[in-house]
Regions:
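Mid/C-terminal beta-alpha module of Rossmann-like enzyme folds, strongest
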Residues: 213-272, 300, 304-307, 314-324
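Conserved beta-loop-beta element that borders a ligand/cofactor-binding pocket
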Residues: 146-171
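N-terminal Rossmann NAD(P)H-binding glycine-rich loop of SDR-like oxidoreductase domains
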Residues: 3-26
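Conserved Rossmann-fold NAD(P)-dependent oxidoreductase catalytic core, especially the SDR/UDP-sugar
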Residues: 95-137, 153, 161
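Active-site helix of classical SDR
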Residues: 141
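NAD(P)H-binding glycine-rich loop region in Rossmannoid oxidoreductase-like domains
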Residues: 39-42, 48-92, 96, 100, ...
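Glycine-rich Rossmann NAD(P)(H)-binding loop
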Residues: 170, 192-198, 225-232, 241-247, ...
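Substrate-positioning beta->alpha
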Residues: 96, 173-179, 193-216, 222-223
Length: 324
């Protein structure tokens, strides 16, 4: 089976392409699609992804597509209309690719969406049956892409699988998770000890394994799955487990949650506060029931792999980018 992987040079894309090199996946050949040359074996440079991208060369002979490429951020103050920027890549770019897949005979399209389509925070675990409630431009663009893909699937027979992962961590992670990892590794006291929430995350190895299952399982076609590790944890528990993986003490200070929330608001870090203070968990029953899939790695195993990568990164620094 020949598989096109978009966003192949990104955090998840690199892990997925590495997985295809393992012996058990020898039946697959991959076409890593990248925006600019990255030196990946067999890569296809497609340039900017939007509603006009020419995918014909990349899709030649391809049986399935894993669509990871997305716009995740826009520079504050530099984009007058963030929603238009997100839609250009995440909605129009996705649907244009799907239509070209239909035209070239691609059978299956695995779309990596986001748990943010469901919402930002909720005490109860999210399920696939919940009505989507995207709260920002990124999440809305992903939700609109999902709706468009379902319409294309209904009209053409393209086998669409939609995956909504929770926060992804693992070797190569960046952004807020890396900042928290660095703080724990450096022994910074963290005022998070009084937080009582539940957060679902997913180790990149588990996400890759789920993608591979969805590529080949007949029952995956037409389904949407929420993805996470097997357990949700509170923010203080995550810090403790992270510290254990790093071989460091967890230096937690218990400050009142309302005080933390107020401080985050003053610092214009409300989005970060939601991720640290509030709950967001998912019920993974559907993918277990329909595909027989369970995460092969535990949270602690994922954190140990991440900690080992971080230690090696400190020993021989290498710039990590979020570009796909």
């Amino acid at each position: 089976m020949k598989v096109l992987v978009t966003g192949a040079s990104g955090f998840v894309g690199r892990a997925l392409c590495d997985a295809f090199l393992r012996a058990e996946y020898a039946k697959y050949s991959i076409v890593p699609a990248v925006r600019s040359p990255r030196g990946l074996p067999g890569e296809c440079v497609v340039g900017e992804i939007d509603g006009k991208t020419d995918w014909r060369e990349a899709l030649h002979g391809v049986h399935a597509v894993v669509h990871l490429a997305a716009r995740v951020h826009v520079m504050n103050g530099r984009v007058a209309d963030p929603l238009t920027s997100f839609r250009s890549v995440n909605t129009e770019g996705t649907l244009h690719l799907a239509r070209q897949c239909v035209a070239t005979g691609v059978r299956r399209f695995v779309f990596i969406s986001s748990i943010k389509v469901n919402g930002e925070e909720r005490a109860a675990a999210y399920t696939e049956a919940d009505t989507p409630a995207p709260e920002d431009a990124y999440a809305l663009s992903k939700w609109e892409a999902e709706q468009g893909l379902r319409q294309i699937a209904g009209e053409t027979g393209l086998e669409v699988v939609i995956l909504r992962p929770t926060l992804v961590y693992g070797p190569g992670v960046g952004a807020n998770f890396l900042a928290l990892l660095r703080a724990v590794a450096c022994g910074v006291p963290l005022p998070l000890g009084a937080i009582s929430n539940q957060r679902s995350l997913i180790y990149v190895g588990n996400l890759v394994d789920a993608i591979l299952r969805c590529l080949e399982h007949p029952a995956a076609a037409g389904k949407t799955f929420l993805l996470s590790d097997s357990e949700a944890v509170s923010t203080p528990e995550l810090v403790r487990r992270m510290a254990a993986a790093l071989g460091r003490p967890a230096r937690l200070v218990a400050l009142p949650v309302p005080l933390l929330r107020a401080a985050a608001t003053l610092a214009k870090k409300s989005a970060l506060a939601i991720r640290l203070l509030d709950s967001l968990s998912v019920d993974g029953t559907s993918i277990r029931r329909d595909l027989g899939w369970t995460p092969p790695f535990t949270l602690d195993e994922g954190l140990r792999e991440t900690a080992a990568w971080y230690a090696n990164r400190k020993a021989s620094p290498r710039k990590t980018t979020g570009k796909t």
